[in-house]
Amino acid sequence: MSDSLRIIFAGTPDFAARHLDALLTSGHNVVGVFTQPDRPAGRGKKLMPSPVKVLAEEKGLPVFQPVSLRPQENQQLVADLHADVMVVVAYGLILPKAVLDMPRLGCINVHGSLLPRWRGAAPIQRSLWAGDAETGVTIMQMDVGLDTGDMLYKLACPITAEDTSGSLYNKLAELGPQGLITTLKQLADGTAAPEAQNEALVTHAEKLSKEEARIDWSLSAVQLERCIRAFNPWPMSWLEIDGQPVKVWQASVIEDATQSLPGTILAATKQGIQVATGKGILNLLSLQPAGKKAMSAQDLLNSRREWFIPGNHLA
């Protein structure tokens, strides 16, 4: 029975907390929780606990917050729990080989893509930006590489034309616990069937940067619309007008050809702000000037029509 396994859980953000909650709700025996140290947050920079820590303390679980698992004394914290398996979900710390080898059944990880596609830090965003038709979660046996371990279980879900990173995150946060609980059952009863990753199919999901989210009008309208959805809700695609950053929350693609230079404003109406791109026209629907709330193109035109005069060029 998987509920008889002694489980260490290691995770930090809300995505991880949802997996911990599923384990506890389904009656699994979580003997200890590792999460990152409290971090300053908000305007007051007050130290705030991670969502995983909040949940673990609510449930009366032992919580450990080492800055690193490299020191011997921190590795001993893991060893002393005598776990059968360690479940790792968006923990954010490297697990040395000594830690990976401690649990009887090793360490398993929930990854937000269908490996070997999109190894790395930003699989959800990269799958959207690439225009993938589907994504999912992979439960894998961890090794010393970055998302290189044998695959134990996969669950797929389609990516719709309306999906943002936020909506896809929520979908995978529902799928992940399902796959995790199934995998734990298979590990417990000896039916797990590890499958090596095909190195020929590997792609890498590099960490996102705010500068990368700046709209590059030389790209096609299709690429830019995907980028806007991929970077929503963070770091948010943006453009610069009058020296001010303006976030773009939503846009649509107009397939019409245009001879105008990329970045040229073609029209500004209540239906949207149409801008020439490297191929096709991008119709900006929802924007957020610095210090303001997100608003429709029509509302922004009512207050800042001078920003969007047809023929002008956006940086």
Curated annotation (Swiss-Prot):
It comes from the Bacteria. InterPro entries: Fmt, Formyl_trans_C, Formyl_trans_C_sf, Formyl_transf_N, Formyl_transf_N_sf, Formyl_transferase-like_C_sf, GART_AS, Met-tRNA-FMT_C. It is an enzyme of class 2 (transferase). Keywords: Protein biosynthesis, Transferase. GO terms for cellular component: cytosol. Its EC number is 2.1.2.9. The keyword Transferase applies. NCBIfam families: fmt (TIGR00460). Attaches a formyl group to the free amino group of methionyl-tRNA(fMet). The formyl group appears to play a dual role in the initiator identity of N-formylmethionyl-tRNA by promoting its recognition by IF2 and preventing the misappropriation of this tRNA by the elongation apparatus. Belongs to the Fmt family. This is Methionyl-tRNA formyltransferase. It comes from Salmonella gallinarum (strain 287/91 / NCTC 13346). The gene is fmt.
